[in-house]
Amino acid sequence: PMNIAVLGMGHLGQAITKYFNGKGLKLKITAAFDVDPEKVGKTIDGIPCYHMDSFEEVVEDKDISIVIVSSPTKVAPNLVLPIINAGIRGVLNFTSTPLNFPQGIIVENYDITTLLEKVAYFVKENEENPTDD
């Protein structure tokens, strides 16, 4: 399996780990990272949670190639350099701040707010201009 880490173990990070845990996919969340002393050093949904200070070391030890960023939006830009330095090859970013990486690192910025606004826009359009099928 391809090993994944979750950066930020708030509500979203924990929901992501719960969702993927035990799915039997070829993707496996093997580590989580946070800075909250209440979370660091604990196992959350079967996944060990490390402090961000040990990010590069854990990524190397666990052969992690993809990260899911679910940190607070204001923290997300500070994660770019550690992600690059650790040799991560893929990023799924769930924050509302688009993250930019050098060529060679695959990035998917997934802003749920923007997507919801898009859906709301089209719902409103359909209500204002109903089509007769």
What are the language-model segments listed below?
Residues 1-26, 30-36:
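Glycine-rich adenosine-cofactor-binding loop
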Residues 13, 25, 32-65:
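N-terminal glycine-/serine-/threonine-rich beta1-alpha1-beta2 phosphate-ribose binding loop
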